[in-house]
């Protein structure tokens, strides 16, 4: 792992710049020469060709496919390790697995720990053993820095920076690790499909869909008009409109999430918060930029998202009950 690179955990823009810098520095690192000579380059070129093919099919940037492929190879190792029961997947990687990578691009991996101390030493030891598991995929991993996450005190935890190597290709990875989240009613075992072969799957523990939705909606309500993450709105919308879920379990999960994050009082005025979000010009502009950036969001109007949130939170039902009855 190149010296002089430390995880920047505050500003997301700085975090992105850090990964770009890391990738640039890694470009100059020489890996041991392959005993097969030119075969080494052909392996790298073959992987890039497969990635470009998937990228064209799904209309996703090739770098996103590469990043997710390397995460996949790490998760396959996790599923074969003694730590399979101790890491629970959540966040964007899980949403992408549920709705499909062509419907949700992600560049990060989020997990919560179960029955494992949330300390740098424990995290490093676990990842070291996971990364040491050998598969016939040509991928290897190097653990870099493990630093406290300071961007949001509600979550806490640590951010791990790794390098994934495939021949001459190096890919920086970022993993957020936290603990103590309220998973309502409990985590579930989920089968993840591999990128290059849908019929190949690996099993890991993950948040149930109602808890995923609850965390997104709590974040939307808590951040209100100060939200700078349009993906929160997209995730809540795409999960609510494409997946089966239990409304009662979602409501319980939302309450449990708010209690755990100590935000129940802060978000109790749901109609007022949603009204502010609905009328906020900055959020509307932010959403329009997101629609232009990601083709999978292009057909979703801001008003549609607001309407789905109102339905999820019972506002539409309340409005219907309170609507005045008129004579016909």
Label every PLM stretch briefly.
Residues 35-87, 96-105, 109-328:
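Structured mid-to-C-terminal alpha-helical surface segments
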Residues 15-21, 31:
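Cationic, low-complexity basic patches in intrinsically disordered or flexible, solvent-exposed regions
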Residues 18, 25-26, 120, 244:
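Hydrophobic alpha-helical membrane context
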């Amino acid at each position: 792992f190149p010296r002089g690179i430390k995880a920047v955990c505050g500003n997301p823009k700085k975090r992105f710049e850090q990964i770009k810098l890391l990738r640039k520095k890694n470009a100059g690192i020489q890996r041991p020469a392959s005993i097969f000579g030119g075969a080494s380059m052909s392996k790298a070129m073959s992987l890039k060709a497969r990635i470009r093919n998937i990228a064209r099919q799904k209309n996703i940037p090739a770098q996103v496919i590469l990043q997710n492929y390397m995460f996949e190879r790490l998760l396959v190792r996790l599923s074969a390790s003694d730590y399979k029961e101790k890491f629970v997947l959540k966040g964007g990687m899980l949403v992408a697995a549920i709705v499909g990578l062509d419907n949700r691009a992600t560049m990060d991996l989020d997990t919560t720990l179960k029955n494992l101390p949330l300390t740098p030493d424990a995290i490093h030891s676990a990842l070291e053993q996971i990364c040491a598991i050998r598969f016939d995929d040509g991928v290897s991993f190097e653990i870099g820095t493990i630093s406290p996450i300071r961007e949001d005190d509600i979550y806490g935890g640590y951010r791990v920076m790794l390098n994934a190597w495939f021949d001459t290709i190096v890919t920086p990875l970022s993993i957020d690790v936290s603990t103590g989240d309220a998973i309502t009613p409990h985590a579930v075992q989920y089968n993840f499909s591999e990128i290059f072969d849908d019929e190949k799957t690996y099993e890991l523990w993950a948040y149930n869909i109602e808890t995923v939705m609850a965390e997104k909606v709590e974040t939307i309500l808590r951040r209100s008009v100060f939200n700078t993450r349009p993906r929160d709105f997209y995730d809540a919308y795409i999960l609510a409109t494409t997946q089966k879920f239990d409304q009662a379990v979602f409501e319980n999960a939302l309450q449990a999430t708010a209690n755990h994050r100590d935000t129940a009082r802060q978000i109790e005025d749901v109609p007022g918060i949603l009204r502010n979000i609905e009328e906020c010009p900055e959020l509307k502009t932010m959403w329009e930029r997101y629609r232009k950036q990601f083709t999978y969001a292009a057909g979703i109007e801001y008003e549609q998202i607001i309407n789905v949130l109102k339905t999820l939170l019972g506002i539409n039902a309340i409005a219907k009950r309170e609507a005045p009855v008129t004579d016909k």
